[in-house]
UniProtKB/Swiss-Prot annotation:
Keywords, in A-Z order: Cell membrane, Cytolysis, Membrane, Transmembrane, Transmembrane helix
Lineage of origin: Bacteria, Bacillati, Bacillota, Bacilli, Bacillales
Designated name of the protein: Holin-like protein CidB
Protein topology in the membrane: Multi-pass membrane protein
Role description: Increases the activity of extracellular murein hydrolases possibly by mediating their export via hole formation. Inhibited by the antiholin-like proteins LrgAB. In an unstressed cell, the LrgAB products probably inhibit the function of the CidAB proteins. When a cell is stressed by the addition of antibiotics or by other factors in the environment, the CidAB proteins possibly oligomerize within the bacterial cell membrane, creating lesions that disrupt the proton motive force, which in turn results in loss of cell viability.
Stretches that traverse the bilayer: 4-21, 30-52, 62-80, 89-111, 147-169, 204-226
Length: 229
């Protein structure tokens, strides 16, 4: 098959399956029917049935990645709209995100050390709550396995976006600041997309939570590894 045609088909496949998955979620309003999860499973099934390799899919997937990188800039819009509120609560925002990052590191690092996992495994799994673009770089720089890092980043994001609403309701969190920061800190881009579905203010705080988590983590992970190894 012509490479250009295959790329176009893979792009169309992704868009159509995501659109259908989103319609299914809208109809049944079930958090388990996450469109990213359903679309991913559907794409895998189609690729397996049609005998298309990952390399073949990425002929179109690469272009989607380029578009996604550009759409990150759009996250600046809700930040701009809520700049006064963000400035007002900046200390609380930074403290909350820093606490979340540290607790995540302590939990992951301690658990893996107790079970005797190697440095490479620890480095691979520590960036799981960072947005993929930064998490992959951190993992590669410190000797982790980036493909496994990506898997855990996606899994973490999906779990957070699926269970986030339920956990926030159970915890009684109704503030857009609390909801947004929780989504951004725990489940990066997936969580931010979910927060934007709630309201634009939650999306803004999720965006800043995601950004701060990436920045703080990219500084603290190398320091943590340096201290213990």
């Amino acid at each position: 098959m012509n490479e250009y045609l295959q790329a176009v088909l893979m792009i169309l496949l992704t868009i159509v399956l995501y659109y259908v998955s989103k319609k299914i979620q809208d109809k049944y309003n079930n958090p388990l029917l996450n469109p990213a999860l359903i679309a991913s499973i559907a794409i895998i099934i189609v690729l397996l049935v049609c005998g298309v390799s990952y390399k073949g899919y990425m002929k179109g997937g690469t272009w989607i990645n380029h578009v996604l990188n550009a759409t990150v800039v759009c996250l600046a819009y809700p930040l701009y709209q809520n700049k006064k509120k963000i400035k007002k609560y900046l200390t609380i925002i930074f403290t909350s995100v820093l606490t979340g990052v540290v607790l995540n590191f302590v939990l992951v690092f301690t658990t893996l050390k107790i079970f005797g996992y190697s440095k490479d495994t620890i480095v691979t799994l520590l960036p799981r709550s960072i947005t993929a673009a930064v998490g992959i770089e951190v993992s590669q720089e410190l000797g982790g396995t980036d493909t496994i890092t990506v898997l855990f980043i996606i899994t973490t994001g999906l779990i957070g976006s699926i269970l986030g609403s339920m956990l926030l309701r159970m915890g009684g969190f109704k503030s857009s600041i609390a909801r947004g920061l929780t989504y951004g800190n725990a489940s990066h881009a997936f969580g931010t997309a979910k927060a934007l579905e709630l309201d634009i203010e939650s999306g803004a705080f999720s965006s800043i939570g995601m950004i701060l988590t990436a920045v703080i983590s990219s500084v603290l992970i190398p320091v943590l590894i340096l201290l213990f190894y």
